């Protein structure tokens, strides 16, 4: 059977379920696939609860995470949906970015209201830049008291507002994932309403090719008689021959030059696009002017920095991480895109030390500048071994 080609006709959106353990994230994920498979049978196939629940292990930057990926379509959009069953998996997934979310469905049990993990997930969602949250008040079939439902809704809106989400206007949809799976009409409709709210409210993400050009430098070499070539995988944007570019990071000063040719496997290309591995021939650039770890960018689109705040997950001993805690002034390497840079860590006030398996905020000062922007991901390494992973939450200098 021929492999089905990926239809590019619809906007593609990455979404995930977040919320407290046992509030029904995985059941809701299964219910969405079933309801949509019944509603649009030619577009979808249902996934049973246990197909979502036994999430396969994935390695992301050396960290093992259990994450389930399902896909489904509404009339308007194609969705890729991630569900991390365990709380620790969810935290790791958010911070290491095994799955980038364009929006999230926050699952809150109407019988419980927001719980500690609900708060932590919403906080993390804000820190890692999830743009929009739609709320599913699950298990609503078990709450007869209308006032109680309203109270839970109020608490959830309050929680969203406290983390700078639009709590006043976020859609809050009472659902029953279990009843929807059982085919109860009222609750099947509730899941359809939920997906309509996701369609209408989660903003369509900007495609990578539409963003300003950025390519991390992986290798640099000289072609006699032609000049210096840098190779790497284009992270975003499109570059044309004779475009001006800027080389940013590692060195004190950024430099500008022109790309005279773009090549892939020794063939000349008309352009370089997001996702492609290419070689760029740089005009008048010496081999020693460029090095791995720098980035080739659209001029002025990104700046080099040495100081930032971050949210970090530290690997546990079982995950191959450190065996003992670390304190402020710890000096590991920070691996950004293609290279390691040493940095000094300052822990937040009130945090004396960080244990393996913890997640924490920290401030970092690097010894060399890195082309940096909010939410940029990095690994923390000691002698080439990954001991943590994090994201930039704020650039400070």
UniProtKB/Swiss-Prot annotation:
CDD domains in UniProt: EF_Tu, EFTU_II, EFTU_III
InterPro entries referenced in this protein's UniProt entry, alphabetically: EF-Tu_GTP-bd (IPR041709), EF-Tu_GTPase (IPR050055), EFTu-like_2 (IPR004161), EFTU_2 (IPR033720), G_TR_CS (IPR031157), P-loop_NTPase (IPR027417), Small_GTP-bd (IPR005225), T_Tr_GTP-bd_dom (IPR000795)
Region G1, residue ranges: 19-26
GO molecular function: GTP binding; GTPase activity; translation elongation factor activity
Catalytic activity, reaction form: GTP + H2O = GDP + phosphate + H(+)
Annotated residues for binding of Mg(2+): 26
Region (G5): 176-178
PANTHER family: ELONGATION FACTOR TU, MITOCHONDRIAL (PTHR43721:SF22), ELONGATION FACTOR TU-RELATED (PTHR43721)
Function field: GTP hydrolase that promotes the GTP-dependent binding of aminoacyl-tRNA to the A-site of ribosomes during protein biosynthesis.
Subunit details: Monomer.
Name assigned to this protein: Elongation factor Tu
Organism: Brevibacterium linens
